[in-house]
Each structure stands twice: as structure tokens, then as C-alpha cells.
Amino acid sequence: MAPQVTPIHDDTPPPLVDDVGPIGGQALLEGVMMRRAGAWGAAVRQADGSITTTAAALPSDGTGVRTVPLLRGPVALWDSVSLGTRATLWAAQARGTSDGKGYSKVGLALTTVLAAVLAVVVLGVAPALVPQALGIEGRWAFNAVESLVRLGVLVGYMGLLSLSPQVKRTFAYHGAEHMTIHAFEHGSDLTPPAIRRFDRRHPRCGTAFLLVVILVALVVHVLIGEVSGAVLVATRVLGLPVVAALAYEVIRFAGTRRHSTIGRVLMAPGSWLQGITTRPPDDDQIEVAIAALRATLAAEEPASAPAPSTAAVAR
């Protein structure tokens, strides 16, 4: 029998199941992708109400550089972006949208690279040029203004995105993903009524990671000291992998201590930002997240199909 489940945000920590292993995911176009160490799966809701799923095994990643602190962060991020791009392409094609038909692997890869470059410029370099242009001196004052500008850009962008009806639906799928992961991690039944009892925010969320990156960058840039011109730009670009690696370790640490005082403190900023990037899902959206999780779990089994497969599930 599944253990008694209490809301994640309740003062009494709910029981975690120790042997389920880590799981993550992301929201897709009218769908959800889930990932575990040995497999990934995705599901999308079709216009006729059916759910289409896909799943595939993943190569073992429990050895080598993926286990080394600081080095594992950038590798994990690269894996996440690569798989996220693959799942996004599949979702667009599976739904038969005009956008999906127009995508190609090369085109989507180029779009991802361009988006990454734009993010580095807008979130990495541009905020540092603001205090320099204003003539602000002193490492703490300079970096405080830089971080506030960076935070403002991030929150403003998320806020503008949330005004779009389609993005609001994607944010609801984001919430469904988190709630389903919570339910799985706590041994709950994978049904909409049971899953609804869980928080739509999660400590390992990529949104939380972005905010932790900003906070870690503040500390790292203060330690670097006062620089300007080309050196300033170089430190913001070349220092990004270091900042990302440290931020990954912070998120990993907080995720393993989510019910401790230090864990709650570390998770608080990211939890607040997830209030923007997640929305309460309806039962249809939760069903899609459940389908993605079940497809992922099935792909981990030795008897599962070793190659990606697609199946329609009646609504």
C-alpha cells in the first residue's frame, strides 16, 4: 500500500521513498518529457484527446566524469539540453503541427545554439555593462547592480512569456511534471486525485537553477574583483562554465536536503520564481505527465523495446 501522502509545502515533511532513483523532466508543446538514468519518455495530448507517447533507453551514465563534482554539472547540463531538444522536436512532429513539420534536426540544433548565444549575451554580458556605463565603482556595488539587472531581465522575460495563452498551458504542463515527479518520489498512486495533493514546485527545477546561477555569479564576480572593458566581458563569458558547475552542485545539495533548514533556504528563491513558470494543471495535463512517466519506467525494464516506440493511449 502506498504511504500516506501530505502536501510538499506542509510543515510536516512527507515520506520519501529511498529506492526510486532520481528523475527529471520538462514541459513540451502540449506534453511532458520525463528522464531517469536509464531511459527517457515523453507524451503529448493530441487534438482528438488521445495521448501519444515515445520512450527510449539511455546509455549508462553512472561512471566517469559524470560522477566528479564540478565536472558533472556542465556534462549534465549538456545532456539535458540535448535530450530536451530531441524531445521538443518529437513533440512538434507527433502533434503534426505546421511548426513540427517544418523542423529538422539541424534547424533545431542551430536554433538551440543561437538561443544559447543570445542568453549568454543578454543574461551574461549585457547586465555587466550597465553598472560600467553608470560609472559605479566598488566590487560589491558593481556586482550588486549587475545581479539586479540580470534578475530583472530574467523575471521580466518570464513574466512576458506568461502572458501568452499557449505558454500558460506549457507552464501548466510544467506544474504537472513537477507534481507527478513528487508523487513518484513519495510512493503515491499515479492518479490525478493523488497527484493533485503535491506542490507544483520542485527543488531540482531548471527555473530554480537559473536563479541559483545569478546568485552564484554574484559571489564569483565579487571574488574576481574590479575589471572593465574586454576583461569584464571575458570574465562573464569564460567564467560561465564555472558558475554553472557551482550552481549545479548547490541545486544538487539542496535537493538532497529539501526538508532541512539549509535546504529550505537554498530552495526559497527558486521556489518563488517557479510561481511564475508553473501553473496549476488540470486532470488532462496530469494524465499526460503520468503517461510520460510510465513510458519512461517501462523503457527501463529489460523487456522493454530497446528503440524509441510510439503508441496512442485513449483519453
Predicted features and spans:
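Hydrophobic alpha-helical membrane-embedded segments
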Residues: 68-72, 145-171, 240-256
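Cytosolic/matrix-facing juxtamembrane and C-terminal tails of multi-pass cellular membrane proteins
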Residues: 256, 260-306
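Hydrophobic alpha-helical segments of integral membrane proteins
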Residues: 70-88, 130, 176-183, 199, ...
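Juxtamembrane "helix exit" motif at the C-terminal ends of alpha-helical transmembrane segments
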Residues: 86-94, 115-138, 213-235, 241-244, ...
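Select subsegments of transmembrane alpha-helices in polytopic membrane proteins
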Residues: 105-122, 202-214
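Juxtamembrane helix-loop transition segments at the membrane interface in multi-pass membrane proteins
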Residues: 41-43, 50-56, 129-136, 157-191, ...
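Residue-level signature of catalytic and energy-coupling elements of molecular machines
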Residues: 31, 167, 205, 273
